[in-house]
């Protein structure tokens, strides 16, 4: 089985600066693998047998130049890494990202695609589902467990009150939650070995992808201004306390 695990590079949260104008400054923010995609990479590594091949794939802009992140990905189990770096993908919205990923995986070849449920920055929860739709594949999201029985995958989805069990054949797309595993901490041997694994770097033209006319445009990201807390505590549920709470809520909404 050939498994492709798709991941996104996001800025390190602790390095993001909020400006006086309530915008975000990413100038000093280093790149890292999105936390939810670490679960996807680990899921692929746990699912694969010795006869299987795991490829990691990402698309994006300047963040993909980070060699430290490349080694980090490859130290976590994938046998090879594919990067599609292009200025058009610098701030791509989910649909364009999905179209680029779909074009790339078709060129690479695959049996199973594994995504994180959402990205660690915007958490739109769209890209994996869109890739499945573009490729006309079976897609399951909210995956909390994967087992392999021959050529069949047994998938668990944890819903609000139930656990849904689904049998699935490949090719397919899975979007996994953070509950599925605890991502490994790579050993020194794995980190050193990562430098010997192949890295394939493409541009948009290499996968016959170009940006479509935008249906929406990301014009900016702003942080809501902080407001002072009222520090009003009502510590009982008497009719008088409930009436007092209602008055405070009315004042806050007016």
Model-derived segments and their meaning:
Residues 1-254:
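N-terminal glycine-rich FAD/FM-binding segment characteristic of electron-transfer flavoproteins
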